[in-house]
Amino acid sequence: MAGTATCSGEGGMIPDERRYSSKWFYQCIQSRYGFNPHHLVLADGCEFFIGQGCKVGLGGHLMGQKVTDQVAEMRSLPAGIDQRSPARHPDWLGPDDLALKIQEIREATDWQIPIQLKLGAARVYDDVRMAVKCDPDSIYIDGMEGGTGAGPHLATEDTGVPGMAGIRQARKAIDDLGKSCLLYTSDAADDRLS
């Protein structure tokens, strides 16, 4: 990979992916499938998956036929069985809990890796205001352009907000709070958005 950042995605680390990635983010998802603190310390960053642009506010349903032996091993699940992911993190009730979770990850990694929050583009201004107060290093606005193999067709194909459409509201939310936070979107992960 030519200097690109790669994310583990939903479900753990693939050793070869980590080995060949110059920058690798470990994604912490709602279901905690495949979560391993030993893998977290191998990461260049941690991304908390809070929402996905192509299915904002929805959990996931991965059909059993997609749970191959490799997927099952990464996620610590039985192969061939349907799997569901909740829409929210079960140990968070609100922004205060998220701030505590960010602090836990910072302490577990000795403050050596940045923390990113992935938000689905929906109520961008309000969501970013809450997220920034939790003190992440960056926020990733995921627009409807992203894909998923675990969502209802109507949500993944016919709804959503484009990532670039959410950037203006996200930037305004950060500026209104007088805070500083890197901002990215799936359309243009670029420091010019910061």
Question: Each PLM stretch: what is its role?
Answer:
Residues 1-180:
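Active-site entrance/lid segments in N-terminal catalytic domains of soluble metabolic enzymes
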Residues 184-194:
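Single conserved hydrophobic/aromatic residue that forms the stacking wall/gate
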